[in-house]
Design a protein with these regions (language model features):
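Flexible, glycine-rich terminal cap/loop adjacent to redox cofactors
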Residues: 134, 138, 150-262
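Residue-level signature of catalytic and energy-coupling elements of molecular machines
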Residues: 1, 26, 79, 125, ...
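Conserved beta-strand segments of alpha/beta enzyme cores
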Residues: 32, 58, 85, 171-173
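FAD-site-proximal beta/loop scaffold in flavoenzymes
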Residues: 58-133
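Glycine/Thr-rich phosphate-binding loops of Rossmann-like dinucleotide-binding domains
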Residues: 11, 73-76, 115, 183-185, ...
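Short acidic-glycine loop/turn motifs at beta-strand connectors
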Residues: 45-46, 88, 201-203
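Rossmann-like dinucleotide-binding cores of NAD(P)H-dependent redox enzymes
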Residues: 1-50, 55, 115-122, 130-164
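Conserved N-terminal phosphate-binding loop of PLP-dependent enzymes in the Aspartate aminotransferase
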Residues: 30, 93, 197-199
């Protein structure tokens, strides 16, 4: 298997430290990666396919999978006739409360331009339902939604990473530990990965977290709850975590903050 990626790293939205963990695993498993590469052409050949890169190198294989992203399936919804405006990518334009340009018409889920995850679409419908029923309204823009790549090991995140924090000039303190430092990881042999957390230096609240490792998709929800509760990292530091568990890593990475380790 060869993965051709035009970005400098796989999973280019992640911090380089996260991407490198997956790249290292791929390399160990014999998966080749062509990073910073562009495809010039692709053609069928006997028994497979050949791809030519911009530097004139050829990659041959039995099958070719092209991943170019998604587009909304709004062509046949009758949006124009209903007076519902779309953006330049054909997503339905919505406001903070999912309202469209047509009175009393709302849009939730993938077509509304929300992050395209099933769990986000589910939460969209809950937020809209609460609003329509006159219940307490949570803010759409301030929610903390997790995401998981079900690779092996898994990659999970919530909130800001270093890349996004720097782009927005948001100050942060960073703590990071290798997944191999967890006793449970050592015992099970699932020791590849890293845990990273960004904390607001003023409020001690979590700005975001990234995890690569076994059960990362489960562990990230510790930070999701912490962020939704607007609690400080003391809630993690003072909690009792069963030993030996992967969840101990959540506490360990927070306690690795420089001001906590002194």
């Amino acid at each position: 298997v060869t993965v051709v990626e035009h970005g400098e790293h796989l999973m280019s939205a992640e911090d380089a430290a996260v991407s490198r963990e997956i790249e290292a695993v791929f390399a160990e498993e014999g998966i080749a990666t062509e990073l910073g590469a562009k495809v010039r052409s692709a053609k069928a050949k006997k028994g497979g396919v050949a791809v030519r890169l911009a530097d004139d190198r050829d990659i041959e294989g039995s099958h070719l999978l092209v991943a170019t992203g998604r587009r909304p399936n709004t062509d046949d919804l009758g949006c124009e006739a209903a007076g519902i405006e779309l953006d330049e990518r054909a997503f339905v334009l919505t406001g903070e409360h999912y309202e469209t340009s047509a009175e009393n018409v709302f849009a939730v889920g993938d077509a509304s331009g929300s992050p395209q995850f099933t769990h986000v679409a589910w939460d969209d419908h809950r937020l809209l339902f609460d609003r329509l029923m006159g219940r307490t309204i949570r803010a759409r823009s301030s929610r903390s939604y997790p995401y998981v790549a079900f690779t092996d090991p898994e990659v999970a995140g919530v909130g800001l990473n270093e890349k996004r924090a720097r782009e927005r000039s948001i100050p942060y303190d960073l703590a990071t530990i290798p997944f191999s430092s967890l006793n449970r990881a050592y015992e099970t042999g699932e020791n590849k990965g890293v845990l990273r957390v960004l904390v607001d230096p003023g409020s001690d609240r979590v700005l975001g977290a990234s995890i690569v490792g076994a059960q990362a998709g489960e562990l990230i929800h510790c930070f999701v709850v912490l962020m939704e509760a607007k609690a400080t990292i003391d809630a993690i530091v003072n909690a009792e975590f069963a030993h030996p568990t992967f969840a101990e890593g959540v506490q360990s990475v927070v306690m690795a903050l420089e001001r906590r380790s002194k």
